[in-house]
Regions:
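A compositional/biophysical signature of low hydrophobicity enriched in polar/charged and small residues
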Residues: 1-77
Length: 77
């Protein structure tokens, strides 16, 4: 299993809707609205890096209101 944090910049007025849409995806373990340069931070999990990439490009980046993402892989606890 591979985990990553996805930092999301959302369109004006869309952070809550983006976080709600993310929480409906089975790969998303948590999604919260935050302050700072990013609007939403999501923790996602996938079986491998290839699947993780697909989740980001095909499912997260296509959510209405998502403008930009930055992904950081979890390397340890």
């Amino acid at each position: 299993m591979v985990q990553a944090y996805v930092f999301i910049q959302a369109a004006m007025g869309k952070p809550s809707a983006v976080a709600e849409a993310l929480r409906r995806l089975p790969e998303v373990k948590s999604a919260v609205v935050v302050t700072g340069p990013y609007d939403v931070i999501a923790l996602i999990e996938a079986p491998d890096l290839q699947a993780l990439g697909r989740v980001i490009t095909e499912r997260i980046q296509t959510i209405e209101g998502v403008e930009r993402t930055l992904t950081s892989l979890v390397t340890g606890i």
